[in-house]
Structure formats: structure tokens, C-alpha cells
Amino acid sequence: MSAQADRGRVRRGLPRWARALCATVATLAALGLAFGAGWATHAVTDPHPDDAPRVDALLVLYSQPRVYDAAIELAASGVTDRLFVSAYLGPDGHEKLCGGPGERDPRLAGVSVECFAPDPVTTQGEVIHAADRMRELGLHHLGVLTFHQHVERARLLAERCFTPEEGRVSLYAFDAGFDRLGRLQHGVYGVLAYGKVMLTPGCDQQLPGVLQWPLDLAKRLRGQPVGDEAGAVVVGARR
């Protein structure tokens, strides 16, 4: 019997309703993926930072050295007197906030700075640490500083760990100075990363390794370390 005849017999063996159901499920799945990709693209390309005039503490998400200067400017302008600084790659400028008396920016006088290495080494690890510290300190308004393409995903992750019942989350954005290629790379990575966000709805929920590796590969292509490749640099609170 020919292969074509075999396929025909298989098709005839499936009831019409089953074939219709499979087609409907496949169509709905495709529409769901298309909607999700469109929503993620909109969130990455059209963020809405809050720029609140004052927060109890500001979480400085690591992305590139410019974020440290932006954090110093916000603290110096009176937005906050407490910084949680994700600083695990140094020395790359974080010493302006986390260094000794001779290295620290003088504009941070009177500002409490807590530098930490997140676990895991992701935005998720950073917001977990900040949320824990907010609860320990009895604080209720958390600011989060990151670059524009990351604002809405950072908001979603932060609000999962520091819920509306516990307080408020406000986002700030800084100019990362990306060129066209850099914006494209971060945009594509941001859209892909929303897949992980949707698959891990819990605050500390992690993807299985087989699903995490594409995101790790994207990080490496952007020149960022992954997991244990990041050298932990932790400095305690300074004022």
C-alpha cells in the first residue's frame, strides 16, 4: 500500500469533529501567540514611566554604567534617600555608589546605599531582594530605575513581588544611549523575555533549564554575563 493511501486512511480514521477541533485549537493557539507578541512589542516600544516626585527607596536595576549616574541624579534631586543598587559586574561605575569614601559621589551625602548581588542574576532576582528589604524596613513606596525598553516588564515583575496590598511601585527610565542596533537587540530580547514572564507567574518561579537557555543565549549575544559568570560584588549599606 502506498504512503499516500496510508495518509488517506488516517484522515478517514479521524472523525470530522475531531479534525475540526484540532484545527480550531491550532488557530486559537496561533492567534494567542500573535496577540501576545503584539502586546509584548507594544509594552517594549511604548513604555510609560511614572517619574513619581518621591519614593521610600529606589531599586537601581543593572543594565549599563549610565544607570548609576541616573540614580545619583535622582537621589541628589530629592526623589529618595535610600538606594538598593544591583552591583555585581564591577568595577564599571558602581563604585560611585558602592565604593569607599574616596570613590563615592559626594552628592550621595545623607543617602543610604545598599549594594547587593541578586540571586538569581536577573531582574527577577533584583526585585525579590528589593521587595524583601522593603518589608524588613516597613517601607511602602518602591521606585525602580531602568532603561526605556525594560520599564513595563520591570513593573510587572516588581508588582508580583511587592504587591499592591503591600505598597506602590513607580518606574523611572534613563537614557541608555543605545544606537539603532542596540535598540533592536534590546527590543527583541524584551519581547522574548515576556514569554518567560508569562510562563512564570510567581514572584520567585523559575523556568526549567531547557526553556531558559534561549534567554541566556540572547544575554550572551548582548555581552551580558549569565548566572555564575557574573562576579558578585556586594557592599553593605552606606550613608
Place the predicted regions along the sequence by residue:
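A transmembrane-helix-recognition feature enriched in membrane-embedded lipid enzymes
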Residues: 180-210
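Charged phosphate-binding loop/patch that engages nucleotide di/tri-phosphates or the phosphate backbone
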Residues: 200-239
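A general structural signal for short secondary-structure boundary/capping elements
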Residues: 88, 103-108, 189-195, 215-221
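Aromatic-anchored segments of alpha-helical transmembrane domains
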Residues: 32-35, 174, 178, 217
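Terminal targeting segments of Actinobacterial cell-envelope proteins
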Residues: 1-15
